[in-house]
A protein has these predicted regions:
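Peripheral docking tails and interdomain loops at the edges
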Residues: 357-402
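Short hydrophobic alpha-helical segments enriched in small aliphatic residues
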Residues: 3-7, 16-19, 26, 30, ...
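Structural signature of the thiamine diphosphate
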Residues: 182-239, 352, 392-402
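Conformationally flexible catalytic loops at phosphate/diphosphate-handling active centers
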Residues: 208-293
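Thiamine diphosphate
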Residues: 79-173, 185-205
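Glycine-/acidic-rich phosphate or pyrophosphate-binding loops and their flanking alpha/beta elements
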Residues: 50-55, 278-301, 314
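Redox- and metal-dependent alpha/beta enzyme cores, enriched for Fe-S-associated oxidoreductases
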Residues: 291-325, 330, 336-342
Length: 402
């Protein structure tokens, strides 16, 4: 069951976008959008494929009208740039694909392309995304949209090439300097790897804020059936000028320059810019929370998990219920904004919450803040690239809440 915060009713995962005013840093911009939905085409129009999560994301980028990809190879996300190179979208849609000299170069190319109103993206894995944090902070400060894909691996440092979820803090707390956030979507299937590309760009341009797809080595490398989105043409220059009046497009007839920058030397103006940024974040928190619940109708306990850990949690629930333990699942889809009100509501009549992560305990801090001591919260996780087994989670449930 998908639920959105606009209706508080079960729904398909879709948000309709209308003309909405979003505060810029020095002026109010009117962002123009048409209604967008996920997977609304019929089966006859859909193209079903069997592929890896990384491959599905690359195909979705081509089909969603992305203008450019700039990236650097790193396991376990290299299939993204490999697939784009194999598909040669520059010959069909005109999409630019560049293997940059580094992750630092990649994110700054995204900064430049996004500042021109283009739909541009990059992808990397944990240590590579760490190198991108300066550029992401600059994009957030300048109000530049763009997509960053993080297919997580174990750390710290160079770590391992095995899957992990240890980038949670880096993604949800604004990994660079300054008071900022990025929208973070956590897929738990190959289908969502494809679906979240268009959704990420929609939200990123709606609010002029970077968006991140926080995946991991399990989701990136696993193969599943996926319904690819229909082909959508890239926007014309005229459409970009109309939809992105803030963008630096070099258009003729403009007497006042459009400057894309995060720099402001006057503190009183910088404070105003920051206050407007915080107001934008409040709007996002109010309107863009997404999550999924399962087996919660009669649940006495709840597992909170995201990404691949949520897939494992579903099997855990099956095993636990076979033993008479009534447990349900709460899966945050947006890690930022985090569904804290929804978790608090779901926890009202519970005996305990187990937060399952492939890390030492990160999301559990947000869950504890959400329930505010009303119910016991325990954590179970594995480290170093080890993926937890469902039987281990069942054992943790019994030990923590016996």
């Amino acid at each position: 069951m998908f639920t959105d915060t606009n209706t508080q009713k079960p729904s398909t995962p879709t948000h309709a976008l209308d003309v909405r005013r979003v505060e810029s840093y020095v002026q109010t911009d009117v962002l123009l959008f048409t209604e967008k939905k996920w997977r609304t085409n019929t089966m006859a129009e859909q193209e079903v494929k069997l592929m890896k999560g990384n491959e599905a994301l690359a195909h979705a980028a081509i089909r969603c009208g992305v203008d450019g990809y700039f990236g650097y190879p790193i396991t376990p996300q290299t299939e993204i740039i490999e697939t784009l190179a194999e598909e040669k979208p520059w010959e069909t849609t005109g999409m630019v694909v560049v293997q940059a000299e580094s992750e630092v170069a990649s994110i700054n190319m995204v900064y430049g392309g996004g500042g021109c109103g283009k739909k541009v993206m990059t992808s990397s894995s944990s240590p590579g995304v760490a190198l991108m944090q300066e550029g992401i902070s600059y994009m957030a400060g300048a109000g530049v949209p763009g997509l960053i894909v993080d297919v997580q691996r174990g750390g710290p440092g160079l770590g391992t090439i095995q899957p992990s979820q240890s980038d949670y803090f880096q993604a949800t707390r604004g990994g660079g300097n300054g008071d900022y956030y990025v929208i973070v979507l956590a897929p738990n299937s190959v289908q969502e790897m494809a679906d979240f590309v268009d959704l990420s760009f929609t939200l990123s341009f709606k609010y002029r804020i970077p968006a991140m797809i926080l995946s991991d080595g399990v989701i990136g490398q696993m193969m599943e059936k996926v319904v690819l989105p229909p082909m959508k043409p890239r926007r014309t220059e005229e459409e970009i000028i109309k939809e992105c009046p803030w963008a630096s497009t070099g258009r003729v007839g403009m007497r006042d320059p459009l400057v894309i920058t995060s720099l402001e030397l006057k503190p009183e103006i910088m404070e105003v810019r920051n206050l407007r940024l915080q107001e934008k974040y409040r709007q996002i928190k109010a309107n863009e929370v997404r999550y999924e619940t399962k087996f919660m109708e009669d649940a006495e306990y709840m597992i909170v998990a995201f990404g691949s850990a949520a897939r494992i949690a579903e099997k855990t629930i099956e095993l636990a219920r076979a033993e008479g333990i009534k447990v349900g699942l709460f899966r945050p889809i947006t890690l930022w904004p985090f569904p804290e009100k929804e978790i608090k509501e779901a926890a009202k009549n519970l005996k305990g919450i187990l937060v399952a992560e492939i890390n030492a305990g990160m999301m559990i801090e947000d869950v504890r803040l959400a329930v505010d001591g009303a119910v016991k919260c325990a954590h179970y996780g594995r480290l170093g690239g080890i993926v937890p087994e469902p039987e281990e989670m069942v054992k943790a449930l019994k030990e923590e809440f016996k």
